[in-house]
């Protein structure tokens, strides 16, 4: 895969909602100059699945998130929140 991992390292995005995670994945995909279809092929998924993930729609299996991240050269990192302030809009949840 032609992902430039060094270029990807300078972009760290913290997410707290499905919509934010989808937007982050879309941003990484765009930086890697990949289409949804090419990312789907690399991840062993359908293009429609990538679209749903990027839109934060429905429920997504954790294995799907890991497959997408692996195809983009990303890893999932858990850490304590930086603040207790909720930093998203209600429409990000519903």
Question: How should each PLM-predicted stretch be described?
Answer:
Residues 44-58:
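Recognition helix of helix-turn-helix/homeodomain-like DNA-binding domains
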Residues 43, 82-83:
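Conserved beta-strand edge residues that scaffold enzyme active sites
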Residues 23-42, 67:
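Short basic helix-loop element that most often maps to the first helix and adjoining turn
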Residues 63-79:
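DNA major-groove recognition helix of helix-turn-helix/homeodomain DNA-binding modules
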Residues 12-13, 23, 51-53:
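Short, contiguous strand/loop micro-motifs
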Residues 1-20, 83-94:
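N-terminal flexible/basic segments that precede or flank functional cores
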Residues 21, 44-46, 71:
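Short N-terminal alpha-helical targeting/association segments
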């Amino acid at each position: 895969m032609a992902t430039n991992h060094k270029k990807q390292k300078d972009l760290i995005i913290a997410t707290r909602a499905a919509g934010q995670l989808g937007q982050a994945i879309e941003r990484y995909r765009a930086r890697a100059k990949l289409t949804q279809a090419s990312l789907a092929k690399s991840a062993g998924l359908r293009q429609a699945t990538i679209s749903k993930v990027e839109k934060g729609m429905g429920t997504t299996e954790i294995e799907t998130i890991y497959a997408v991240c692996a195809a983009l050269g990303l890893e999932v990192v858990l850490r304590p929140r930086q603040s207790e302030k909720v930093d998203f809009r209600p429409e990000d949840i519903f």
